[in-house]
Structure formats: C-alpha cells, structure tokens
C-alpha cells in the first residue's frame, strides 16, 4: 500500500536526520516520566510508575502536545495511547459531544478524575448507533488542555478503589500548580483538502488561543489559572446526493426500478411529487447537499483555576475548578423541496357564483383564500389573516410580514409559491405545481437543518488535607453540572405548516442537564509490621447524588410530528430524576518481602434505586530480578445505569424515517415487554511483564480479559412500518408510541422505537505493549523512542431474548440481529501500534509518530439483502512536527498530521441500476448506483440521499491531512 510505504520512509528519514545533526538539549525522557510519582492505582505514598504493580502510563505536556496537532485532550490521548480510542465524528447531537473509551469498551466504563477526584458526566447522551452508543461520560474537551501538568492513565479495572464505573480503567488529569510564570500560546490549522476529500464548500480550519499563569497565594500558596478559546469550522466528506444528480429525480423512500434508459440511468416509479432538478441545483454544496458526515462547527471558551495553601506541614486547603461554554452546530441530512409543502385548495375558476376564485373555503382547513381580484390570505393558528392591499399580497409564515407574489389576479393550479418571499416558483415548464392544486412551498431549493447546542459546564472542588494521629486525611466536596440547550435551525414543522400555513424556521428544542454532587473523605496510615515495607491501610467513604433532567422545548417544535430533523422535547418527556449512592472502601498495600508487592481492596456501595453491591480487587507484583518483574490483577466491577440511560426520550427524524427513543423505565417500554434496567457486572483479569534489560530501556507487556454481564446497549429499531428485512411489529409499536404521547411523521416510510436494555454480555481480551528507550547521539541530539501497541478483541456472548409480547406480534423479531452483533465486535480495529521518535538538539526539536492501524470490518446498511461490505485495509498514518526555540521564551512549531493525506477506503460499490431487473426494490439500507454522474465507488446507503464515502466511526480522521502552526511564549 503506497501510503504505508511512504509513511515508513518518512520515519526512517527523520531518524537519519537525528543522527547527522550537531550537542543535545536535555528534556524529560520517557524514562524520566516513568519515575514520576503517581497518585493513581495505588494508595502508597511515593510510588512511581516504573515500580507500580498496576499498568499505568504517565503523559506529560510534551507527550500530549508534540506531534498531535491538537489542543483537545481527548484527541491528544487518542493520538498517544493505543488502547484509548477517540471518536472522530458522529451524527446528530452525538457530533456535538464526541466520546472516548479504553480497550474498546463503552465510554461509560472509564472513570475520569481531576486531581484524583471524580469528574461529572456530560448531559448529552449518544443514542445513535456505532462507537460510543449509549454513552454520557465526562467530556474531556471542556478541560483546558493548557491547564494540564500531566495525565495518568490506569489500564486496569479499578472499581474497588475509585468507584463502580471504573471497569476499563481510569484517566486522572493532574492540573498545573505553579506559583509563578506562565505561557501564552496560539495554534492555527487547516485540512489539506479544506474540508475532506469530497471537495469542498466547508473548510475545516481550527484556531486556538490559551493563556495561563501561576501566582503566589500569600507566602505559602499558589493560584494557577488558565483560559482557552477554541474554534473549529465545518468539514464535509459525504458523497453526492443521487436525488440531485439523477435525471430520474429519485423520490424519498422505497423506490421501484421500472426500467433503464439508454444512458444507464434508472427510471424509478414516483411515490410522491417529483422535484425539477433546476430548483435544487443551486443549493449550497451541490451536489453534495448532505453535510451530516463531517466535523461540526463550534466555539469553545473554557477556564480553569487550581489553588492551594499550606498553613503548616500538617494542614492545607485546596480548591480547583473548570468552567466552559460551547456553541456548536452540526449539519443534518438534506431535505427535498417537497418535504414541507401545503396545498392551498382545489382549483375553481372565477364565476358569478364563485367571485373569490378557487376554494372560497367555508372550512379553515382549506388554508388559503384567494380572490379573482388579487388578495389572498394565509391561515394562522388564530384563524385567517385578512390582507388588504395589493393583488397577490400574503403573509410570510415564518415572520408574519406582508409579502407579494408580484402577480395581479388570481392564483392558478399551475402555480407554486415560495412561502418565504411570496414569489412564484419557476420550473422548466413554467410555474407547475407539485400536485394538482396550488401549493405553498417553504423551501423551494430544499433545506439542510442544523442541530445547535449551547452548552454551559462547570465543576468545582474544595477540600482540606491534614494529619491526625498518624493518619493522612483528605476531605473533599465537589459539584459539577452540564446544561445543554438544544435548537434546530433552518427547519420547519411540516404538519404545523399544513394545518396553519405557518411555521417557525428555527426552534428551541428544550434542554438536557446532568449534575453530580460528591463528598469524600480518605485516610491513609502506614503501619510497621515487620515486613519489607510498612502496611499501608487506606479507608474512605463517599456520598454522591446524581441528577438528570430534560426540559420542555417550544411547543411548536413538538407539535404533532414535530420539526424536521429533531422535534424537540415535549412536556410528556420532560422531568428531573435523581438518585443517591453511598460507598465505603478499604485498601491494604504491603511488601511482605522485598521482591513482592500486594494490594488488596474492597468496596461496598448502596444505591437508592439498585440496592447494595460488593466488589474487590487483588493486585500483585513480583520482581524476579532487578531487571524483570511480573504483575497481575483480579478484580470485579459494577456499573449502575446512568440516569440518562434510564430516562432519556426523544424522536429522531430523518427525511424518510422517524424513530422514538423510549425511556427504559417507562410504561411505554414496559408495554413492549421491557423491564427496568439492571446494573452491569464485570470480572477482569490481567497478567503482565515489566522488563529493564538495559539501563535506559524499559518494556511492559500486559494481557487482559474483561467479561461484562448485563451490558447496557441500545436496541435495534422495532418498526411499526418499514420495508422487507426490517423488524416490523405494528400491534406493539403503535400502542407504545401512543402511550409515550408522541405523533410520528405519517410520510415516513419507516417508523419505530428503540430503548436501552441489558441486551448482551461481552468478553474483551487483548494485550498492551510499551517500550521506551532514550538514545543520546552526543553532538547529533537526543532521541526518545517510544513504541506502544494494543491488540484488542471483543466477543458478544449472551443475547437478551425478545420478550414474549413482541414475539407474539412478530415471531421473527429480535433486538439484536447479526449486523448489530458484528458492529459490537468490529467497531474498532483489533490492532494499533504507535512508534514515536522525539528529537532535541539545542534550540531545535522534531517529533515523528507513525501510527499503524489494523484492518477494520464494517457494513454500511442494516441487515438486509443489500448489505454493502466496507472492509477498511490496514493503514499507516504519519505525523510530523518541527520546533525551534527562537529565544529562551519563544518557541515556534510547524507540523502536519497525516502527512500523506490518507483517507479511509471508499465504501464498496453497490451494483449498478442497469444490472437490476424491473421491479427490483431499492431498500433504504443499501441501493444501486443511479447513473453516470455518481463518482466511482460512491454508494448511496439510505433513502435520505446520504452517501457515506467512509464508514461512520472511522478510527482516524476521515478529513485527511491536517497542517498546523503553533507559537508559544513562556514567561
């Protein structure tokens, strides 16, 4: 593969350059990082990463910044820790809060700490399929990366030590704590292709500015603060919309091939009104009107404060916190002009008995009155608005302002009106209406809604540390909250428009919020009991209260079927939910003999809604020689469902489908035979080797196995209507939808429900490898070499059987088909290897990182006969950064991620329409190519006209190469 070959050549070239350059400038090596005293994974004071019995990686600011090209902590960790997977993009609101995970498990199974204390969750629940589905974990992007001193990543189950959701591991973020000095940094970058490989109308540029400073707090304290501003533009990498470029004007939904023309373009039956191409050709981004696949646009402003004061050697206080505001916009699927159209009435010519022209309208349902002499009126929610004045005058339904068609006389059935400006809509054959009656069209060129979020997030912790009777105490209280106000812009409510001929274009959808209050007290005491080390006893208690709320949106957003793209949160789905839990733990750590470390921990938790649980952990390390050691862990874990998993409800609307997410703990879900959620349980094993065969060479190999039972996942869609191959159970789905108080779009070809449930059991197995070696080339510089790799497999075991009531409605119904299982097992590549060379010489520095990804297997559509395999081949991605210290305080860095501009493989091509016989059904899950205008290999994958050129949830940035520059001033 050319990209892999070129990547390896660059790595070799930079290594050679490091050997011919001229005295080395000392910097923190990976070996020195291993000697950093850690606070994660152990209660023993003074423990280093190199001596730890648990596998832990320490990443300083150099490791996080050099060669990553990002100021987002989530992306920085994703670039440097192979077992840490950072989501690249998502759909809908999932694109507004991207998630990350350890070892391919749910993001909910990774605990995030800041300065050793629990971080609150995001309120934004990822309900779309694919990577991170069901997660509402802590949002790492809201912590200013410029405020971070280092990060400790514990790759081991630690629920018994830190809390019952630390099944996969722990990410502990340690903030800077300086009392003097500071830095000012600015970053700017853009993609090679200015917004992906589909050509672009979206640029994808990014900007970042940060300022941090440490101040003395009287004579014995510090106050370190940071402010950061980030901006990212839209990018777009979807394919061409066949409805735009196909002369047959493929209508929405299930389409039937009726023949093939001489040019190879399929002739499709028309289910609904056709739209002339000349109306839509001027859309922004034509013909790639679907911009749902790509980066969101956002502005993020965040701040951080970390302060402490030592009153004496035995008593100190501390406080730290973060605050952030995000304004983000995510593109949605393009809608054709016929998506929001109102019929104005049947045509009745002027006559003595009908002086007002067509449909004088004794019923307000007619929606429009016209006069042979000119004026017409649009019906509003309060009745008709009579409009005196010029012929053709009317109301703009979005603004209420008077508009004019500019046409004297009556309106005929051959006419369409632009609802936003009152102008007649031209077509290739004149002002031809979509149907047999005059029609009011809200978006004559179609429209592309946006889901918008205005997020406010904050957390603060205050505490004290003191010594009493030989015990070291740490008492802390913390409170965090995340509030998301959600909007849908550039949209409209179809049924409201039909009923009233008026609709807002922008909607307030409502809000979702999550908060967490935590109070903890920890105490440790070393006891000398005659062994090789003191017995360190740690005890602690925690009280926590979590809340989750959904706030009602604009009633016009949820009126009947609701606004296009997202109908908001109705009153029936709003509410605030809470629970409390109380925990206590005890931890014993000792070295019975000099070569052996033992750590045993136990934890008891009580949940007000789930009762009690007891979990434990045993960790051991044995140093065979000073150079070689073995280590291992056995642990159990427990994760209660998040409140979002229990109570979230919303309707997801696409141009051709409407799906209701049922609250797991609701009467509607119970009607479908679903029971309330239960906690997940886990059992983990790990065994590793630690080696120091040379003075500066260190290596670790850790194998692991994590079994999770009652895993909480989102079900496949159970449909009330749909096409062959779907799970269809209308006798259950329609009553459940009605009980939930929701009206779905009657034009949707697929309508159904999903819900979270304890659906599967999984077994995750793999191995983590790290090798660190600094090489001093004398006059040619110092190179820190790091090799890090992860091999990970996921196997789905038990599947929850469908409830009897669902099987009675449809004997073939299942919550998890083979496609769903395949997605769980292959959502990330099995293999990832990072090779990093970090070189310094006097004022110069350079970093080369080669990331090798193994193959990934995926399908574009649901499990039906048109599944299109999309196997992504293994690939090598090269990152390169060069640095120069202009002065002792000023540094310039220039770099590129994905130097060779590699993109994921284009999805496998579908069969050409010309090869399909007349009468063939084109399902929404996978279709044929519609004509010669479609680029080679592009595949239309759903009835929305959306074309995925790369699978959703790709493992590296599908936008391709990214170049950047960074300037930093230290003082």
What are these model-predicted stretches?
Residues 539, 704-860:
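Gram-negative outer-membrane beta-barrel transporters
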Residues 180, 197-445, 449-463, 467, ...:
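Transmembrane beta-barrel wall of Gram-negative outer-membrane proteins
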């Amino acid at each position: 593969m050319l990209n892999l070959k070129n990547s390896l050549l660059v790595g070799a070239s930079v290594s050679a350059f490091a050997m011919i350059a001229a005295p080395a400038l000392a910097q923190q090596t990976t070996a020195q990082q291993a000697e950093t005293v850690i606070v994660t994974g152990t209660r023993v004071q003074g423990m280093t990463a190199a001596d730890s019995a648990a596998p832990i990686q320490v990443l300083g600011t150099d490791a996080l910044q050099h060669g990553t090209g990002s100021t987002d902590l989530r992306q920085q960790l994703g670039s440097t820790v192979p077992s840490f997977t950072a989501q690249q993009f998502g759909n809908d609101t999932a694109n507004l809060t991207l998630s990350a995970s350890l070892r391919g498990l749910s993001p909910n199974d990774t605990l995030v700490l800041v300065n050793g204390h629990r971080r609150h969750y995001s309120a934004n629940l990822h309900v779309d399929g694919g990577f991170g589905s069901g997660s509402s974990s802590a949002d790492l992007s809201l912590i200013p990366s410029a405020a971070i001193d280092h990060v400790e990543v514990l790759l081991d189950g630690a629920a018994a030590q830190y809390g019952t959701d630390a099944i996969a591991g722990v990410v502990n973020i340690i903030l800077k704590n300086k009392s003097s000095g500071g830095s000012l940094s600015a970053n700017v970058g853009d993609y090679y292709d200015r917004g992906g490989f589909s050509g672009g109308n979206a640029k994808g540029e990014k900007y970042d500015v940060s300022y941090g400073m440490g101040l003395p707090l009287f004579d014995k304290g510090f106050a370190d603060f940071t402010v950061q501003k980030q901006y990212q533009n839209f990018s777009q990498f979807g394919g061409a919309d066949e409805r735009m470029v196909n002369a047959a004007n493929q209508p929405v939904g299930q389409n039937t091939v009726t023949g093939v023309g001489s040019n190879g373009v399929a002739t499709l039956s028309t289910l609904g009104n056709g739209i002339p191409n000349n109306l839509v050709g001027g859309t922004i981004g034509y013909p790639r009107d679907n911009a749902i696949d790509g980066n969101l646009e956002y502005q993020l402003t965040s701040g951080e404060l970390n302060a402490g004061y030592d009153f004496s050697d035995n008593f100190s206080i501390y406080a730290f916190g973060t605050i952030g505001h995000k304004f983000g916009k995510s593109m949605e699927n393009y809608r054709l002009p016929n998506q929001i159209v109102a019929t104005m009435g049947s045509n009745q010519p002027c006559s003595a008995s009908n002086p007002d022209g067509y449909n004088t309208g004794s019923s307000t349902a007619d929606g429009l009155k016209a006069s042979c002499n000119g004026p017409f009126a649009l019906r509003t929610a309060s009745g008709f608005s009579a409009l005196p004045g010029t012929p053709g005058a009317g109301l703009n339904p979005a603004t209420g302002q008077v508009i004019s068609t500019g046409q004297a006389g009556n309106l005929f059935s051959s006419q369409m009106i632009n609802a936003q400006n009152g102008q007649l809509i031209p077509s290739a054959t004149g002002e031809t209406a979509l149907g047999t009656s005059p029609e009011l069209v809200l978006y004559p060129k179609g429209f592309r809604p946006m889901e918008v979020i205005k997020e406010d997030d904050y957390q603060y912790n205050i505490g004290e540390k003191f010594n009493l009777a030989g015990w070291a105490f740490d008492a802390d209280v913390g409170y965090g909250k995340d509030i998301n106000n959600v909007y849908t812009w550039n949209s409209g409510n179809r049924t409201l428009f039909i009923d009233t001929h008026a609709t807002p274009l922008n909607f307030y959808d409502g809000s979702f919020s999550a908060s967490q209050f935590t109070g903890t007290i920890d105490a440790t005491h070393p006891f000398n009991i005659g062994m090789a080390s003191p017995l360190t006893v740690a005890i602690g208690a925690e009280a926590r209260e979590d809340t989750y709320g959904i706030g009602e949106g604009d009633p016009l957003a949820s009126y009947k079927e609701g606004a296009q793209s997202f109908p908001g949160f109705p009153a029936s789905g709003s509410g605030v939910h809470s629970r409390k839990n109380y925990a206590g733990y005890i931890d014993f750590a000792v070295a019975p003999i000099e070569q052996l470390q033992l750590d045993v921990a136990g934890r008891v938790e009580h949940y007000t809604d789930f009762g009690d649980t007891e979990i434990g952990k045993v960790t051991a390390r044995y140093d065979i020689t000073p150079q070689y050691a073995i280590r291992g862990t056995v642990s159990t874990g427990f994760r209660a469902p998040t409140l979002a998993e229990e109570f979230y409800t919303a309707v997801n609307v696409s141009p051709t489908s409407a799906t209701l997410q049922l609250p797991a703990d609701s009467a509607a879900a119970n009607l479908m035979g679903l029971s309330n959620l239960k906690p997940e349980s886990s059992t983990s094993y790990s065994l590793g080797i630690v080696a120091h065969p040379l003075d500066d060479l260190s290596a670790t190999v850790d194998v692991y196995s994590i079994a999770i039972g009652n895993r909480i996942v989102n079900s496949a869609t159970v449909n009330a209507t749909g096409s062959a191959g779907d799970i269809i159970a209308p006798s259950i789905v329609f009553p459940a939808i009605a009980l939930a108080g929701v009206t779905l779009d009657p034009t949707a070809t697929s309508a159904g429900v999903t819900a979270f449930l304890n659906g599967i059991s999984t077994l995750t197995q793999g191995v983590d490898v790290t090798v660190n070696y600094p090489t001093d080339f004398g006059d040619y510089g110092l190179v820190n070499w790091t090799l890090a790799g992860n091999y990970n497999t996921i196997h789905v075991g038990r599947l929850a059987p469908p409830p009897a009531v669902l099987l009675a409605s449809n004997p073939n119904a299942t919550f998890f088909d083979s496609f769903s299982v395949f997605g769980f097992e292959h959502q990330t590549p099995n293999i990832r290897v990072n090779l990093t060379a970090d070189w310094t010489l006097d004022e110069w520095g350079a970093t080369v990182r080669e990331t090798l990804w193994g193959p990934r297997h995926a399908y574009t559509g649901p499990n039906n006969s048109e599944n299109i395999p999309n196997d992504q081949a293994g690939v090598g991605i090269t990152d390169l950064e060069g640095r120069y210290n202009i002065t002792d305080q000023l540094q310039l860095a220039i770099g590129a991620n994905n130097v060779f501009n590699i993109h994921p493989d284009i999805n496998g091509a579908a069969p050409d329409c010309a090869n399909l016989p007349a009468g063939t059904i084109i399902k929404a899950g996978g279709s044929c190519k519609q004509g010669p205008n479609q680029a080679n290999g592009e595949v239309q994958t759903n009835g929305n006209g959306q074309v995925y050129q790369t699978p959703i949830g790709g493992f590296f940035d599908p936008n391709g190469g990214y170049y950047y520059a960074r300037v930093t001033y230290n003082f």
